[in-house]
Protein backbone atom coordinates (compact mmCIF):
# COMPACT_ATOMS: atom_id res chain seq x y z
CA UNK A 1 0.00 0.00 0.00
CA UNK A 2 2.80 2.42 0.85
CA UNK A 3 4.39 1.78 -2.54
CA UNK A 4 1.10 2.61 -4.25
CA UNK A 5 0.78 5.80 -2.22
CA UNK A 6 4.29 6.75 -3.25
CA UNK A 7 3.39 6.22 -6.91
CA UNK A 8 0.29 8.36 -6.42
CA UNK A 9 2.43 11.20 -5.11
CA UNK A 10 4.86 10.75 -8.01
CA UNK A 11 1.98 11.05 -10.48
CA UNK A 12 0.92 14.28 -8.82
CA UNK A 13 4.48 15.58 -9.10
CA UNK A 14 4.60 14.75 -12.81
CA UNK A 15 1.34 16.64 -13.36
CA UNK A 16 2.58 19.64 -11.39
CA UNK A 17 5.74 19.62 -13.52
CA UNK A 18 3.65 19.83 -16.69
CA UNK A 19 3.86 16.19 -17.80
CA UNK A 20 0.11 15.57 -17.84
CA UNK A 21 0.21 12.58 -20.24
CA UNK A 22 2.62 10.65 -18.01
CA UNK A 23 0.67 11.59 -14.91
CA UNK A 24 -2.56 10.45 -16.55
CA UNK A 25 -1.10 7.05 -17.42
CA UNK A 26 0.05 6.58 -13.84
CA UNK A 27 -3.30 7.70 -12.43
CA UNK A 28 -5.08 5.35 -14.82
CA UNK A 29 -2.98 2.40 -13.66
CA UNK A 30 -3.41 3.30 -9.98
CA UNK A 31 -7.18 3.64 -10.41
CA UNK A 32 -7.25 -0.14 -10.88
CA UNK A 33 -5.55 -0.82 -7.55
CA UNK A 34 -7.54 -2.73 -4.95
CA UNK A 35 -6.96 -0.16 -2.23
CA UNK A 36 -9.65 2.52 -2.16
CA UNK A 37 -7.44 5.14 -0.61
CA UNK A 38 -5.32 4.87 -3.75
CA UNK A 39 -7.75 4.02 -6.54
CA UNK A 40 -10.32 6.71 -5.70
CA UNK A 41 -8.00 9.75 -5.79
CA UNK A 42 -6.24 8.21 -8.80
CA UNK A 43 -9.53 7.93 -10.70
CA UNK A 44 -10.46 11.44 -9.64
CA UNK A 45 -7.23 12.86 -11.06
CA UNK A 46 -7.22 10.71 -14.19
CA UNK A 47 -10.77 11.81 -15.02
CA UNK A 48 -9.94 15.47 -14.45
CA UNK A 49 -6.92 15.32 -16.76
CA UNK A 50 -8.88 13.51 -19.48
CA UNK A 51 -11.65 16.09 -19.25
CA UNK A 52 -9.18 18.98 -19.39
CA UNK A 53 -7.51 17.45 -22.46
CA UNK A 54 -10.82 16.82 -24.24
CA UNK A 55 -10.44 13.04 -24.11
CA UNK A 56 -13.85 12.57 -22.47
CA UNK A 57 -17.02 14.66 -22.51
CA UNK A 58 -18.42 16.52 -19.49
CA UNK A 59 -21.42 14.13 -19.20
CA UNK A 60 -19.04 11.16 -19.17
CA UNK A 61 -16.89 12.81 -16.51
CA UNK A 62 -19.99 13.61 -14.45
CA UNK A 63 -21.01 9.96 -14.54
CA UNK A 64 -17.57 8.88 -13.31
CA UNK A 65 -17.54 11.47 -10.52
CA UNK A 66 -21.05 10.56 -9.46
CA UNK A 67 -20.09 6.92 -9.07
CA UNK A 68 -16.83 7.86 -7.38
CA UNK A 69 -18.47 9.86 -4.59
CA UNK A 70 -20.24 6.73 -3.36
CA UNK A 71 -17.04 4.67 -3.36
CA UNK A 72 -14.93 6.84 -1.11
CA UNK A 73 -16.36 8.76 1.80
CA UNK A 74 -15.07 10.77 4.68
CA UNK A 75 -12.02 12.69 3.49
CA UNK A 76 -10.90 15.56 1.29
CA UNK A 77 -11.03 13.37 -1.84
CA UNK A 78 -14.78 12.99 -1.46
CA UNK A 79 -15.32 16.71 -1.03
CA UNK A 80 -13.06 17.49 -3.99
CA UNK A 81 -15.05 15.02 -6.09
CA UNK A 82 -18.32 16.65 -5.04
CA UNK A 83 -17.10 20.16 -5.77
CA UNK A 84 -15.99 19.12 -9.24
CA UNK A 85 -19.24 17.24 -9.85
CA UNK A 86 -21.25 20.28 -8.79
CA UNK A 87 -19.34 22.47 -11.24
CA UNK A 88 -19.91 19.95 -14.03
CA UNK A 89 -23.64 19.69 -13.35
CA UNK A 90 -23.96 23.48 -13.44
CA UNK A 91 -22.05 23.69 -16.73
CA UNK A 92 -24.41 21.06 -18.14
CA UNK A 93 -27.52 22.89 -16.97
CA UNK A 94 -28.36 20.14 -14.49
CA UNK A 95 -29.06 22.65 -11.75
CA UNK A 96 -31.13 20.52 -9.39
CA UNK A 97 -28.49 17.79 -9.35
CA UNK A 98 -25.78 20.39 -8.72
CA UNK A 99 -27.60 21.91 -5.76
CA UNK A 100 -28.54 18.49 -4.39
CA UNK A 101 -25.01 17.13 -4.41
CA UNK A 102 -23.47 20.28 -2.95
CA UNK A 103 -26.07 20.58 -0.20
CA UNK A 104 -25.80 16.94 0.82
CA UNK A 105 -22.02 17.20 1.12
CA UNK A 106 -22.16 20.31 3.27
CA UNK A 107 -24.75 18.78 5.57
CA UNK A 108 -22.94 15.47 5.94
CA UNK A 109 -19.45 16.76 6.67
CA UNK A 110 -19.80 20.29 8.09
CA UNK A 111 -16.48 20.13 9.96
CA UNK A 112 -14.26 19.12 7.05
CA UNK A 113 -11.80 21.82 5.88
CA UNK A 114 -13.36 22.04 2.40
CA UNK A 115 -16.92 22.10 3.74
CA UNK A 116 -17.01 25.89 3.96
CA UNK A 117 -15.83 26.15 0.36
CA UNK A 118 -18.66 23.83 -0.68
CA UNK A 119 -21.17 25.98 1.20
CA UNK A 120 -19.85 29.03 -0.64
CA UNK A 121 -20.06 27.18 -3.94
CA UNK A 122 -23.66 26.22 -3.13
CA UNK A 123 -24.64 29.79 -2.26
CA UNK A 124 -22.94 31.15 -5.37
CA UNK A 125 -24.70 28.60 -7.57
CA UNK A 126 -28.08 29.59 -6.12
CA UNK A 127 -27.32 33.28 -6.65
CA UNK A 128 -26.24 32.62 -10.23
CA UNK A 129 -29.53 30.86 -10.90
CA UNK A 130 -31.93 33.34 -9.40
CA UNK A 131 -30.03 36.62 -9.27
CA UNK A 132 -27.79 36.49 -12.35
CA UNK A 133 -30.40 34.83 -14.56
CA UNK A 134 -28.98 31.35 -15.12
CA UNK A 135 -32.42 29.90 -14.30
CA UNK A 136 -34.06 31.97 -17.03
CA UNK A 137 -33.65 29.03 -19.39
CA UNK A 138 -35.96 26.95 -17.23
CA UNK A 139 -39.73 27.08 -17.55
CA UNK A 140 -41.07 29.49 -14.90
CA UNK A 141 -42.88 26.73 -13.02
CA UNK A 142 -39.70 24.62 -13.02
CA UNK A 143 -37.71 27.58 -11.71
CA UNK A 144 -40.29 28.09 -8.97
CA UNK A 145 -40.13 24.44 -7.90
CA UNK A 146 -36.33 24.59 -7.82
CA UNK A 147 -36.44 27.79 -5.76
CA UNK A 148 -38.82 26.34 -3.20
CA UNK A 149 -36.80 23.14 -2.83
CA UNK A 150 -33.72 25.18 -1.93
CA UNK A 151 -35.33 28.31 -0.50
CA UNK A 152 -33.16 28.15 2.62
CA UNK A 153 -30.31 29.34 0.37
CA UNK A 154 -32.07 32.65 -0.32
CA UNK A 155 -29.78 35.35 1.07
CA UNK A 156 -31.09 37.91 3.49
CA UNK A 157 -31.28 41.52 2.40
CA UNK A 158 -31.42 43.14 -1.01
CA UNK A 159 -30.10 40.17 -3.01
CA UNK A 160 -32.74 37.81 -1.65
CA UNK A 161 -35.44 40.41 -2.18
CA UNK A 162 -34.39 40.91 -5.80
CA UNK A 163 -34.29 37.15 -6.42
CA UNK A 164 -37.88 36.71 -5.30
CA UNK A 165 -39.19 39.70 -7.21
CA UNK A 166 -37.44 38.61 -10.43
CA UNK A 167 -38.94 35.15 -10.14
CA UNK A 168 -42.38 36.59 -9.36
CA UNK A 169 -42.20 38.75 -12.50
CA UNK A 170 -41.45 35.67 -14.59
CA UNK A 171 -44.49 33.93 -13.12
CA UNK A 172 -46.70 36.94 -13.82
CA UNK A 173 -45.47 37.04 -17.43
CA UNK A 174 -46.93 33.57 -18.02
CA UNK A 175 -50.10 34.30 -16.01
CA UNK A 176 -49.15 32.18 -13.00
CA UNK A 177 -50.61 34.79 -10.68
CA UNK A 178 -51.48 32.51 -7.76
CA UNK A 179 -47.94 31.17 -7.66
CA UNK A 180 -46.43 34.66 -7.92
CA UNK A 181 -48.63 35.90 -5.08
CA UNK A 182 -47.73 32.96 -2.88
CA UNK A 183 -44.03 33.56 -3.47
CA UNK A 184 -44.21 37.26 -2.61
CA UNK A 185 -46.39 36.59 0.43
CA UNK A 186 -43.80 34.17 1.77
CA UNK A 187 -41.07 36.76 1.26
CA UNK A 188 -43.04 39.56 2.90
CA UNK A 189 -44.27 37.49 5.84
CA UNK A 190 -41.18 35.46 6.65
CA UNK A 191 -38.10 37.35 5.54
CA UNK A 192 -38.70 41.09 5.44
CA UNK A 193 -39.73 44.02 7.60
CA UNK A 194 -39.83 47.77 7.35
CA UNK A 195 -39.71 49.51 3.98
CA UNK A 196 -38.46 46.43 2.03
CA UNK A 197 -41.50 44.52 3.25
CA UNK A 198 -43.78 47.38 2.23
CA UNK A 199 -42.35 47.44 -1.29
CA UNK A 200 -42.83 43.69 -1.74
CA UNK A 201 -46.32 43.93 -0.22
CA UNK A 202 -47.34 46.50 -2.82
CA UNK A 203 -46.10 44.16 -5.56
CA UNK A 204 -48.19 41.43 -3.94
CA UNK A 205 -51.22 43.73 -3.86
CA UNK A 206 -50.82 44.53 -7.56
CA UNK A 207 -50.70 40.85 -8.45
CA UNK A 208 -53.79 40.14 -6.35
CA UNK A 209 -55.59 42.94 -8.18
CA UNK A 210 -54.55 41.46 -11.53
CA UNK A 211 -55.94 38.16 -10.25
CA UNK A 212 -59.19 39.88 -9.22
CA UNK A 213 -58.68 39.28 -5.53
CA UNK A 214 -59.27 42.72 -3.99
CA UNK A 215 -59.60 41.51 -0.42
CA UNK A 216 -56.16 39.90 -0.52
CA UNK A 217 -54.80 43.07 -2.16
CA UNK A 218 -56.11 45.23 0.67
CA UNK A 219 -54.79 42.78 3.26
CA UNK A 220 -51.32 43.02 1.72
CA UNK A 221 -51.46 46.82 1.72
CA UNK A 222 -52.67 47.02 5.30
CA UNK A 223 -50.06 44.58 6.56
CA UNK A 224 -47.30 46.68 5.02
CA UNK A 225 -48.52 49.98 6.45
CA UNK A 226 -48.69 48.52 9.93
CA UNK A 227 -44.98 47.66 10.03
CA UNK A 228 -43.24 50.75 8.63
CA UNK A 229 -43.41 54.51 8.25
CA UNK A 230 -44.63 54.47 4.70
CA UNK A 231 -44.30 58.26 4.39
CA UNK A 232 -40.53 57.83 4.37
CA UNK A 233 -40.57 55.92 1.12
CA UNK A 234 -41.70 57.85 -1.94
CA UNK A 235 -42.40 54.78 -4.05
CA UNK A 236 -44.68 53.16 -1.54
CA UNK A 237 -46.37 56.44 -0.63
CA UNK A 238 -47.39 57.11 -4.21
CA UNK A 239 -48.53 53.58 -4.98
CA UNK A 240 -50.68 52.86 -1.95
CA UNK A 241 -53.53 55.28 -2.73
CA UNK A 242 -53.76 53.92 -6.26
CA UNK A 243 -53.82 50.36 -5.00
CA UNK A 244 -56.49 51.07 -2.43
CA UNK A 245 -58.61 52.84 -5.02
CA UNK A 246 -58.28 50.01 -7.53
CA UNK A 247 -59.09 47.41 -4.91
CA UNK A 248 -62.21 49.34 -3.92
CA UNK A 249 -63.35 49.55 -7.53
CA UNK A 250 -62.99 45.80 -8.02
CA UNK A 251 -64.95 45.10 -4.86
Predicted regions and their residues:
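Acidic, polar-rich low-complexity tracts and alpha-helical solenoid repeat scaffolds
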Residues: 1-251
Amino acid sequence: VETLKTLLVQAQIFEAAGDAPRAMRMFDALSRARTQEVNSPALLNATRIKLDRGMITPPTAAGIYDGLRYRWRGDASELKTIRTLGELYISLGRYREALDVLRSAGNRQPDMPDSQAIQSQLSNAFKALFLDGDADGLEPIQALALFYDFKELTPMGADGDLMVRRLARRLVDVDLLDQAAELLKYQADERLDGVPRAVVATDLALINLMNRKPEQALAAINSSTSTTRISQDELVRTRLPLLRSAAGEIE
